Swiss-Prot record:
Species per Swiss-Prot/TrEMBL record: Dictyostelium discoideum
Ranges of biased composition (kind: Low complexity): 472-487
Protein's name in the database: Probable cytochrome P450 519D1
Secretion signal, residue range per the UniProt entry: none
Family statement: Belongs to the cytochrome P450 family.
The gene coding this protein: cyp519D1
GO CC terms in record: membrane
Pfam families per UniProt: p450
Membrane topology classification: Single-pass membrane protein
Assigned EC number: 1.14.-.-
Amino acid sequence: MNVFVLTFFICIIYLLFDLIKKNKKLKDEPPTPKLALPLIGHLYLLGDRPNRSFLELSKRYGGIFKIWMGEYPTVVLTDPDHVNEVWCKQFLNFTNRPHFNSLDQFSSGFRNLSFSDYPLWSELRKLVSSSFTKSKVKGISNLLETQTNYLINTMNNYSINNKPFNPKKYIHKLTLNVVCMIAFSKEIKNDEDVNEGDMARLTKPKEMILKHLGSSNFCDFVPLVRPLFYLKNKRFDQTLKQVREYIKEIYDDHLLNLDLNSPPKDIMDLLIMSTNDSKEDIIIQTCIDFLIAGSDTVGVTIEWFLVYISNNPIIQEKCFNELFNAFSNSNNTDNNNNNSTITTAIGFGDEYSSKTPFLNACIKEVLRIKPVTSLGLPRIANDDTFVNGYRIPKGTQIIENIYGLSNSDQLIDDPTTFNPYRWLEYQKLKSFQNDLKQQQQQQQQQQQQQQQLQLQQEQQEQEQQKINLEFNNNNNNNNNNNNNNSNNKHKYYNDLDKISIPFSTGRRGCVGVQLGEAELYIVCANLVYNFKIESWDGKKINELEDFGIIIHPSSHNLKITKRNNK
């Protein structure tokens, strides 16, 4: 009995000290919500969509605030200046990831590109980044077009048969194939059903891994309760084992057929050659990175694109008309049979995208309103430091609130409305300001060249003053428009390039940005060009995201109608 009483009192004392520790205010620390509870800290404030909870907290406590996520002090950044300070200026102090148990399991001891520490991360990044340059991505345009062909012909069959089309598995088959070909030259056959073969072998484990990593695992933040999650973590290990075995088979095949005298044909070859086959586990884990993250981020963004153009038919028609006017001479249909085979009419590159500014704006707006990695991947402070005057102790977890940056009404006008036109207006304003700056620079150069001629110099000065006055008036007009009916707007208000960073920023940003942009453009352009896309039941599709490490739309069916592009 005395043992139970002693244990009870020890628990009470521990909880009391934990309560005091978490609620003690430190000098120069960021603003903090009032009550952090023992063990769980502020986790009770986050709900089932932490991205939205962090957005609301940022409105109350500002662009940098501190919370306790269980036992981990955490600083959340929802301000471009703070993000730039941590992700770019103080990069070396914030290079590493937190060592949570679930991340340890997934990365086999932090031995992959996503979660490894410096300097291993730096070595891996240098190796793989060469595979994602603009020229390399341009070189795989045939692969992207081929996979898009498969998708649009599948959709055409649904259109012909007037059946509801659930896009998720088919889109993810496309993006998975692209990643598999680039990473290890393996293709899921076009005639292979999405519920069979490699798709079936990979899809479910991939979904389970993403769900586990994105579920804000309680035992990650409160290690004391980890034994209670033994069975859940064991199932996670078993799921990871399935994926590792799949990649290991491919790895063994690469070793068997590797030609050291020829250039590497894919990322796995590149890693094997660069490490002399001495880091098998790291190679396998890095390829799992590409398999899971590389396919799902793009695939889910395409899903969101279809949701928003379905819910906004006027915008969809404007996209189609733009594409039709630009590419209607492309012969993309083979009418030799009743089930006309479609081929991609639109590829990737400046020669295509330069003709479709409105479609480009639609894709950017999807990335703004639904950045699929809504909270990015966390970092940790390696040493004590200050961020714009706020003290950040060593070991503090840092979260980049990507969703909050692009969806806060303190940073952007009407953030919850899908409005591609905002990007067109923004580009016009940027172009106008750049032209004025160039004009000023030219005038200054002319002044320097003609200083010996007093009369010409005076004329130049008068012209310069006039240009400066016009420039200031234009800026004042723009500021007045932006500040109508509101006070104290953020200095980056409606500065879309500053607040919309769906691929993150800095040296540890997404390595596959070029590939992702190419996939998004080719797929979205060809789908809108070939089909009218609506919700199956005629109702608006739910735009509320399901939270995870990747935020995705709820399951839905689409009505696909083939367009007549002749």
